[in-house]
């Protein structure tokens, strides 16, 4: 069970100054949130801490190919550790596609395997609520949704 969760804001390279924060309309992160923060690529201590955790515990992400490719580019030592089998990635979207029969019957354009839609079907996200697109909030939603799916399918040991 996850514990002692942390969230870190990292800065952006100066090339983005004077522009909108990329994807701020999705993540709701503003320049005020990241002003004075070290960019992730330059924050070697945070990278070291994250890589250590990733080698110790598997990590789960919804559409994990995105995180996996991002970390390969931006996290020193990740690609080598991943290739050596020291980092295990679990994709909750693949869990959804494999276990949730609704995915096969709903129209593809309705994005049935999207975390928000899957969570609504499993009752872990209210019909009038939205996925936050913020690390800890979405991680909590993802884990509760996976647990709900596993409970529905009686996949937990008794």
What is the meaning of each model-derived region?
Residues 90-110:
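Short alpha-helix plus adjacent loop in nuclease-associated cores
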Residues 104, 119-121, 136-158:
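Acidic two-metal-ion nuclease catalytic site recognized across multiple nuclease folds
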Residues 66-68, 96, 150:
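Glycine-rich nucleotide phosphate-binding loop and flanking beta-alpha elements
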């Amino acid at each position: 069970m996850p514990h002692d969760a942390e969230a870190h804001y990292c800065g952006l390279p100066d090339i983005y100054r004077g522009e909108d924060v990329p994807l701020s309309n999705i993540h709701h992160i503003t320049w005020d949130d990241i002003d004075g923060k070290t960019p992730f690529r330059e924050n070697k201590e945070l990278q070291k801490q994250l890589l250590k955790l990733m080698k110790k515990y598997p990590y789960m992400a919804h559409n994990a190919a995105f995180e996996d490719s991002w970390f390969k580019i931006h996290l020193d030592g990740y690609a080598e550790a991943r290739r050596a089998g020291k980092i295990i990635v679990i994709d909750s979207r693949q869990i959804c596609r494999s276990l949730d029969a609704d995915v096969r019957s709903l129209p593809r354009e309705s994005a049935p395997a999207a975390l928000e839609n899957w969570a609504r079907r499993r009752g872990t996200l209210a019909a009038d609520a939205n996925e936050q697109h913020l690390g800890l909030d979405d991680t909590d939603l993802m884990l509760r949704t996976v647990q709900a799916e596993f409970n529905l399918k009686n996949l937990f040991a008794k």
